[in-house]
């Protein structure tokens, strides 16, 4: 898999002038409202950049590829599997509930909340679509934690939310295979998880319609993807 990286800003651009390629650094991460940045950047070591080692290429979900029947436990403690969503367009994204960075998991959940609202405006379409937020932190994201998080991001404490949007976590042993399939990189680090972003639209036939790497996509794009996939089914 390609090297994993999370982008950080600095308030004082002058702190970057003392850095060079290959430097290891330590810094304070400051998170405030909808923004985050680094302060007190210090060089802790240096190693010349090395070429990437040879290895197998990362798997990238391709349109038309059938998604394996991965299994999870949802926010209600029920076992669910990918296959049971066949017949509906399934929108999938990855999060962990403790993520503090606004541009990462909180953005994915905010975007999915908007998609949930938009699809809900069309009764026929809402019945043909389903949203799935998958945690890659199964040790911490228990069913109760996922349930509380779901109510928070959905803006509702009605269990009816879960009829169209579920929050799930896999068994820890299954997580590497699931993450690899969806090209999700993650690494526990300093009590948090450094990770990439991965979002997919899966057709009613259980095959990939479209895969989005990163977090630059907008809710209307996925709403259109879901609508088009649902209409093709008719």
Positions of PLM-derived features:
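Beta-strand/loop nucleic-acid-binding surfaces
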Residues: 2-15
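Envelope-exposed proteins and targeting segments
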Residues: 4-6, 21-25, 34-37, 66-68, ...
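Solvent-exposed coil/turn segments that connect beta secondary-structure elements
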Residues: 13, 24, 30-32, 43-46, ...
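Short, flexible, surface-exposed loop segments at domain boundaries
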Residues: 16-62
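N-terminal "domain-start" segment that seeds a small globular fold
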Residues: 42-82, 107-117
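Thiol-/selenol-based redox modules, centered on thioredoxin-like
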Residues: 43, 117, 174-234
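Short active-site neighborhood of thiol/selenol oxidoreductases, capturing the structured segment around
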Residues: 80-111, 131-132
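Structural microenvironment flanking redox-active thiols in thiol-disulfide oxidoreductases
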Residues: 107-177
């Amino acid at each position: 898999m390609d090297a994993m990286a999370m982008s950080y800003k600095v308030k004082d651009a002058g702190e970057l002038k003392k850095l060079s390629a290959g430097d290891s650094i330590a810094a304070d991460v400051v998170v405030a409202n909808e923004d985050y940045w680094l302060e007190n950047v210090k060089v802790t070591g240096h190693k010349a950049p090395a070429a990437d080692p040879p290895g197998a290429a990362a798997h990238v979900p391709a349109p038309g590829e059938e998604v394996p029947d991965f299994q999870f436990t949802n926010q209600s403690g029920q076992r669910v599997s990918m296959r049971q969503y066949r017949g509906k367009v399934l929108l999938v994204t990855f999060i962990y509930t403790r993520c503090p960075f606004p541009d990462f998991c909180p953005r994915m959940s905010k975007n999915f909340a908007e998609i949930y609202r938009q699809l809900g405006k069309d009764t026929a379409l809402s019945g043909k679509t389903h949203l799935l937020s998958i945690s890659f932190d199964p040790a911490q994201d228990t069913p109760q934690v996922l349930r509380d998080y779901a109510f928070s991001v959905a803006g509702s404490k009605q269990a009816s939310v879960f009829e169209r949007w579920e929050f799930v976590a896999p068994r820890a042993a299954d997580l590497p295979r699931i993450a690899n399939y969806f090209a999700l990189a993650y690494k526990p680090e300093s009590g948090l998880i450094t990770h990439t972003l991965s979002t997919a639209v899966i057709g009613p036939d259980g095959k990939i319609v479209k895969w989005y790497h990163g977090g630059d996509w907008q809710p209307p794009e996925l709403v259109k993807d879901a609508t088009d996939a649902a209409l093709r089914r008719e």
